[in-house]
C-alpha cells in the first residue's frame, strides 16, 4: 500500500487492518479519524503527521518517528511505542491504555487532559512536558524523567515512581495517591495543595519544601526529613511519621490527628493552632516549639520532650503524660482536662 492509497482509504472511511507500513514515509500525512487494527508502523516516518481522533488497536511503532505528531483525542490500545520519539507531540485529550512507552522521548510534548491507563513508561523522557490535568492510573513510571514538567492538577494513582527525576518540575494541586516516592530527594521543591494520600514517602528528603495545604493523610513518612518546610494548613491525619524530622518547620494550623509521631523531632517548629488530637507522640521532641492554641486532646505524650515549648491555651485534655518532660514549658498557661467534656465523653445511656 502506498502513502496516497492509505490516505485515500482513510478518507473513504475504510478500516486499516493488519497492514504492514514498515519504513513508510508518512511525514505530514493527514491520517486523522482513521481506524487502525494491528497495523505495523515499524521504522515509519510520521513526523508532523495528523493523527487526530484516530483509533489504534495493537499498533506496532517500534523505531518510528512520531515527533511533532498531532494526536489530539487519539485513542490507542496496547500500542508498542517503546523507544519512539514523540518530541513536541500534541497529545491533548489522548487516551492510551496498556501502552508500552518504555524509553520513549516525549520531551516538550503536550499531554494536558490525556489519560495513560496501565501504561509502561519506564525510563521515558517527559522533560518539559505539559501534564496539566493528565491522568496516570496504575502506570509503571520507574526512572521516568519529569524534569521541568508541568504537573499542575495531574492525577497519579497507584503509580510506581522509583528512581523518577523531578528536577524543576512544577507541582500544584497534584493528586499523587498511593504512589511510591520512598528515599527520594525532593528538598526545596514546591508541592502546594498536593495530595499524597496513602503515599510511601518513607526516608524522603523534603527539607525546605513548600507543602502549604498539602495532604499526607494515611501516608508513610517514617524516617522522612521535613526540616524547615513550609506546611501551613497541611494535613497529616493518620500519617505514619515515626522518627521523622520536622525541625524548624512552619506548621501553623496543621492537622496531625491520629498521626503516629513516635520518636519524631519537631524541635523549634511553629505549630500555633495545630491539631494533634488522638495522635501518638511517644518520645517525640517538641523542644522550644511554639504550640500556642494547639489541641492535644487524647494524645499520647508519654516520654515526649516539651522542654521550653510555648503552651499558651494549649489543650491537654486527657493526655497521657507518663515520663513527659515539661521543663520550662509554661504548662501552667495550658488548658488541662475539661471536666464537662470528660463527663460528656464518659456518659453512657441507661439500659
Predicted regions and their residues:
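Tandem repeat scaffolds
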Residues: 1-351
Amino acid at each position: 500500500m502506498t502513502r496516497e492509497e492509505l490516505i485515500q482509504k482513510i478518507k473513504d472511511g475504510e478500516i486499516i487492518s493488519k497492514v504492514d507500513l514498515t519504513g513508510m514515509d508518512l511525514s505530514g500525512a493527514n491520517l486523522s479519524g482513521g481506524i487502525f487494527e494491528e497495523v505495523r508502523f515499524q521504522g515509519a516516518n510520521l513526523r508532523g503527521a495528523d493523527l487526530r481522533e484516530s483509533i489504534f488497536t495493537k499498533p506496532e511503532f517500534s523505531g518510528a518517528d512520531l515527533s511533532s505528531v498531532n494526536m489530539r483525542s487519539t485513542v490507542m490500545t496496547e500500542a508498542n511505542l517503546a523507544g519512539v520519539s514523540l518530541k513536541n507531540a500534541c497529545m491533548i485529550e489522548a487516551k492510551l491504555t496498556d501502552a508500552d512507552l518504555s524509553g520513549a522521548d516525549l520531551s516538550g510534548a503536550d499531554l494536558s487532559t490525556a489519560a495513560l491507563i496501565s501504561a509502561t513508561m519506564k525510563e521515558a523522557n517527559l522533560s518539559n512536558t505539559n501534564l496539566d490535568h493528565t491522568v496516570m492510573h496504575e502506570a509503571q513510571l520507574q526512572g521516568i524523567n519529569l524534569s521541568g514538567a508541568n504537573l499542575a492538577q495531574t492525577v497519579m494513582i497507584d503509580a510506581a515512581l522509583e528512581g523518577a527525576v523531578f528536577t524543576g518540575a512544577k507541582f500544584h494541586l497534584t493528586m499523587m495517591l498511593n504512589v511510591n516516592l520512598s528515599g527520594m530527594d525532593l528538598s526545596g521543591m514546591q508541592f502546594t495543595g498536593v495530595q499524597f494520600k496513602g503515599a510511601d514517602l518513607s526516608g524522603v528528603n523534603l527539607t525546605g519544601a513548600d507543602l502549604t495545604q498539602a495532604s499526607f493523610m494515611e501516608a508513610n513518612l517514617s524516617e522522612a526529613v521535613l526540616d524547615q518546610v513550609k506546611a501551613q494548613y497541611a494535613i497529616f491525619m493518620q500519617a505514619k511519621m515515626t522518627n521523622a524530622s520536622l525541625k524548624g518547620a512552619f506548621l501553623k494550623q496543621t492537622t496531625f490527628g491520629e498521626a503516629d509521631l513516635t520518636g519524631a523531632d519537631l524541635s523549634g517548629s511553629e505549630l500555633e493552632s495545630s491539631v494533634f488530637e488522638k495522635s501518638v507522640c511517644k518520645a517525640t521532641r517538641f523542644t522550644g516549639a511554639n504550640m500556642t492554641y494547639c489541641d492535644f486532646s487524647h494524645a499520647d505524650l508519654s516520654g515526649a520532650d516539651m522542654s521550653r515549648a510555648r503552651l499558651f491555651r494549649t489543650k491537654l485534655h486527657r493526655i497521657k503524660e507518663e515520663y513527659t518532660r515539661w521543663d520550662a514549658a509554661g504548662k501552667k498557661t495550658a488548658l488541662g482536662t475539661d471536666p464537662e467534656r470528660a463527663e460528656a465523653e464518659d456518659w453512657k445511656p441507661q439500659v
